[in-house]
Curated annotation (Swiss-Prot):
Gene Ontology MF: a single term: ribonuclease P activity
E.C. number: 3.1.26.5
The protein, known as: Ribonuclease P protein component
Origin species: Porphyromonas gingivalis (strain ATCC 33277 / DSM 20709 / CIP 103683 / JCM 12257 / NCTC 11834 / 2561)
Known catalytic reactions: Endonucleolytic cleavage of RNA, removing 5'-extranucleotides from tRNA precursor
Keyword RNA-binding part of the UniProt annotation: yes
Top-level division of the source organism's lineage: Bacteria
Record's keyword terms, sorted: Endonuclease, Hydrolase, Nuclease, RNA-binding, tRNA processing
Biological process per Gene Ontology, one example term: tRNA 5'-leader removal
Classification via PANTHER family: RIBONUCLEASE P PROTEIN COMPONENT
Pfam families assigned: Ribonuclease_P
Length: 137
């Protein structure tokens, strides 16, 4: 278990650069754990944080900004509390991950549903981390 100081979500853990976002969506692998669609990319290039993430909620699904922001807040909170499930594996194997979470539900999910989906998705990504650094990236 990590120390309580690592339960924050710093700027280095947020995915915000256009080039990195395009790389994740262009070269990443995707799967769905309802209500989340997860796109991730593993690489050996050095970063400030072992995993960085972004959250996207479509305006088509939630018309009101208040609801979109609430869903994004729920996903960020679930990630913040459960990121140790993935970061421990990434740190041990010296691999870096960029992850995009997109909400595919049309209804406002509760925190318990989002947290279960987040745990399943982080465990699934951790299971796909190779045992040694990637050669071609």
């Amino acid at each position: 278990m990590t120390s309580p100081a690592t339960f924050g979500l710093s700027k280095s853990e947020r995915l915000y650069l256009r080039d990195e976002i395009n790389t994740v969506f262009g070269e990443g692998k995707a799967f769905v754990v309802y209500p989340l669609r997860v796109v991730y990319r593993l690489g050996s290039e050095h970063r400030a944080a072992y995993s960085s993430m972004l959250v996207s909620v479509a305006k088509k699904r939630f018309r009101r900004a208040v609801k979109r922001n609430r869903v994004k807040r729920l996903v960020r909170e679930a990630y913040r509390l459960n990121k140790h499930l993935l970061n421990d594996v990434l740190q041990e194997r010296q691999i870096y991950a960029t992850i995009a979470f997109m909400v595919v539900s049309d209804e406002l999910p509760d925190f318990r549903t989002v947290e279960r989906a987040m745990q399943k998705s982080l465990i699934r990504i951790a299971g796909n981390v190779p045992s040694s650094a990637l050669k071609n990236e």
